Swiss-Prot record:
Subunit-structure text: Monomer.
EC identifiers of the protein: 2.7.6.3
InterPro entries, alphabetized: Hppk (IPR000550), Hppk_sf (IPR035907)
Organism, as annotated: Haemophilus influenzae (strain ATCC 51907 / DSM 11121 / KW20 / Rd)
Molecular function (Gene Ontology), one example: ATP binding
Pathway it works in: Cofactor biosynthesis; tetrahydrofolate biosynthesis; 2-amino-4-hydroxy-6-hydroxymethyl-7,8-dihydropteridine diphosphate from 7,8-dihydroneopterin triphosphate: step 4/4
Catalytic activity: 6-hydroxymethyl-7,8-dihydropterin + ATP = (7,8-dihydropterin-6-yl)methyl diphosphate + AMP + H(+)
Function: Catalyzes the transfer of pyrophosphate from adenosine triphosphate (ATP) to 6-hydroxymethyl-7,8-dihydropterin, an enzymatic step in folate biosynthesis pathway.
Name of the featured protein: 2-amino-4-hydroxy-6-hydroxymethyldihydropteridine pyrophosphokinase
Gene label: folK
Coiled coil: none
Superkingdom of origin organism: Bacteria
Keyword Nucleotide-binding: yes
One annotated GO biological process: tetrahydrofolate biosynthetic process
Length: 160
């Protein structure tokens, strides 16, 4: 089995419930085991500011699904939970992104792993560090170094 990390985010239709439903759906994927999940964090939107705050988390899974099959399954879960893409970095009921898939580096028209720009996003790095404090990314970046830039993050840890 391959260890993968999934970022979860929502800012519409009761975001905490959206994340819980997504985690349940991920745990039910074939040949996949949900290992652990970070705390949930409330964060400001990355893009347009005329939208509600987000709730974000990171999940660690073990899977036998290929990266593209995992992507297909995550997009199916997004769609089942009412995901509509209206604008770039806009509001959404659910956003599921593959951050890491083993030590693989993948770049094609459908998928980029490690997830592009993840190292600059506090709502990814802080929860990822919480569940994988000894992680080394495929490009040799070390999570303990990446998280230092977010020592003064403004996210609020939730206890859902």
């Amino acid at each position: 089995m391959i260890t993968a990390y999934i970022a979860l985010g929502s800012n519409l239709n009761t975001p905490v419930e959206q994340l819980h439903a997504a985690l349940k759906a991920i745990s039910q994927l074939s040949n996949t085991h949900l290992v652990t999940t970070s705390s949930f964090y409330k964060s400001k939107p990355l893009g347009p500011q005329d939208q509600p705050d987000y709730v974000n988390a990171v999940a660690k899974i073990e899977t036998e699904l290929s990266p593209l099959k995992l992507l297909d399954e995550l997009q199916r879960i997004e769609n089942e939970q009412g995901r509509v893409r209206l604008r770039r970095w806009g509001e959404r009921t659910l956003d599921l992104d593959i951050l890491l898939y083993g030590n693989e580096i993948i770049q094609n028209e459908r998928l980029t792993i490690p997830h592009y720009d993840m190292h600059n996003r506090e709502f990814v790095i802080v929860p990822l560090f919480e569940i994988a404090s000894d992680l080394v990314l495929p490009n040799s970046q070390i999570i303990t170094e990446l998280v230092k830039q977010f020592a003064d993050h403004k996210m609020i840890k939730l206890n859902p």
